[in-house]
Regions:
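Cap/lid and interdomain-hinge subdomains that line or gate substrate/regulatory clefts
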Residues: 14-16, 40, 59, 72-75, ...
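Conserved, well-ordered active-site substructure
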Residues: 375-436
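A structural-propensity feature for long, helix-poor, extended segments
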Residues: 58-67, 326-328, 412-447
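N-terminal basic/disordered segments at the start of proteins
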Residues: 10-57, 77-81, 129-134
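Conserved, well-structured core segments that form the ligand-binding/active-site neighborhood
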Residues: 147-322, 327
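General beta-strand structural signal in soluble alpha/beta enzymes
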Residues: 19, 42-44, 94-98, 126-130, ...
């Protein structure tokens, strides 16, 4: 098996773990989970520059790509570039991070990226742990559940980019790879590590491929961390990150108080201004969060793609209202809406055109408002929106701070030279409770 380290690392302190994440909010999710386990973590936006590499001192480095909805060949190319960077940093383990709802299509690209990473690292069998029990994602008999609902009945079947129409992950992943896809089910998990190791060894002896691991509770994650702590390559959601981090801390005899200190580093860039919230997610969780925030009497502005298309001056009005509103209170600007209204806009404008119109509006708002003195910090909800905003602001990396909700921390946004930009929270659409926005603002006020 090929070693992970190719050349001398460009950091004084070598990270033990390198994560390749397929979108920005997903990267922040796993970075937060690593910090929860006591591991100092840096998240980069795309492949980091040499100067940024030189400034990084961390136990884990998360490279955030925007590859989730890309054609498989493009996603593979980006992922292999990230792998090369992480190997140069000297990491001992690679973690391919995707969403806990396994966001993909029959055309890819989880299977193809996994195959490419296996080939590059000469790994015969890739274990997938997609579950995230703390957020209600579990895998039983190879089927992914959101709460008590099968994935394809949870609303994810209506996802505009990656509609998930089959909860059977063995079958779904099998459509994305020519390699064998198998399952280590609950009946094996309950017997313990020895039986799991035996199943993996037998599968590998038969030619290897991909194995989906059942996981229904946190104790299952602890067991999987024990099994996979020395694996050169693992794949899944962020669920496995915290127990892996804790095992690293224990193995290196890191004092408990040091782990606790690392896990609660507050962002240092919180300013006196108010919080700007930009939401492009149309998930049911985000829609509930918006409605809850609206009921507090907060300043909320909705972006309607049909009106944006018909009224070019509308965006200037929204910007003026946002900038003025931030002088007195937090402001939420959202394009999030019901499936019916989203589809109506897509039918009228075209799905791609509607998405780009909204994305550009958020970019304009972020560029104009993010560095104003009345803007204290920024929250962005939705993976695609987060990617667009982060790129527009020239953010190259995130130093992970305190957790707002599982998988969503406050962070310090850094530029390509490692200089501080502002405090930022990137929220995956389905994460957080109904009161998320108010909780985030309250935490920022305490930091």
């Amino acid at each position: 098996m090929r070693t992970l380290t190719e050349t001398k690392a460009c950091v004084v302190r070598k990270p033990f773990l390198g994560v390749i994440a397929d979108d920005y909010t997903g990267a922040t999710d796993i970075a937060s989970m690593l910090v929860r386990g006591g591991v100092a973590t840096i998240q980069t936006i795309g492949i980091p520059s040499q100067s940024l590499c030189d400034s990084m001192k961390a136990d884990a480095v998360v490279i955030a790509l925007k590859s989730r909805a890309l054609p498989a060949a493009d996603a593979v190319a980006q992922s292999l570039a990230a792998l090369s960077c992480l190997r140069n940093l000297g990491v001992r383990q690679i973690y391919f991070k995707y969403c806990s709802t396994f966001d993909s299509t029959p055309a890819g690209n989880i299977g193809q990226v996994g195959d490419a990473l296996c080939a590059a690292l000469e790994v015969s069998t890739l274990i997938h742990i997609p579950a995230l029990p703390v957020n209600g994602r579990s895998v039983y008999q190879g089927h992914l559940f959101v709460g008590t609902t099968l994935l394809h009945q949870s609303g994810m079947e209506n996802h505009p980019l990656n509609p998930m129409t089959d909860a059977n992950l063995v079958r779904w992943l099998g459509r994305q790879t020519r390699r064998t896809v198998g399952l280590i089910g609950t009946s094996v998990i309950t017997k313990g590590r020895a039986d799991i190791d035996t199943e993996i060894a037998a599968f590998t002896a038969g030619g290897g491929g991909h194995l989906i691991g059942d996981t229904v509770q946190d104790s299952d994650l602890e067991l999987w961390a024990q099994v996979l702590q020395s694996a050169p390559l693992v794949a899944g959601s962020s669920g496995l990150a915290t127990p892996l981090a804790r095992r690293y801390m224990a193995a290196h005899q890191m004092p408990a108080e040091m782990a606790e200190r690392k896990a609660k580093i507050p962002p240092q860039t919180v300013r006196n201004g108010h919080t700007l919230i930009l939401s492009g997610s149309c998930s049911s969780a985000t829609l509930a969060q918006i409605e809850t925030f609206r009921t507090t009497g907060a300043h909320c502005i909705q972006l309607d793609p049909l009106r944006l298309s018909a009224e070019p001056a509308l965006l200037d009005e929204v910007l003026e209202s946002t900038v003025t509103g931030l002088k007195n209170a937090p402001v939420l600007v959202y394009a999030s809406d019901s499936l019916h209204k989203v589809q109506a806009a897509q039918n009228a404008l075209g799905a791609v055109a509607a998405g780009k119109l909204v994305e550009q509006a958020f970019v304009t708002l972020a560029q104009a408002a993010a560095r104003l003195p009345q803007t204290g910090q920024l929250i962005v909800a939705g993976g695609e929106t987060s990617g667009a905003v982060v790129a527009a602001l020239g953010i190259a990396a995130l130093r992970i701070g305190p957790e707002i909700a599982p998988g969503v921390p406050w962070t310090e946004a850094l530029d390509a030279q490692g200089a501080l930009v502002l405090s930022l929270a990137l929220k995956s659409g389905n994460f957080g409770g109904d009161g998320f926005f108010s909780q985030a603002i309250e935490l920022a006020g305490r930091a």
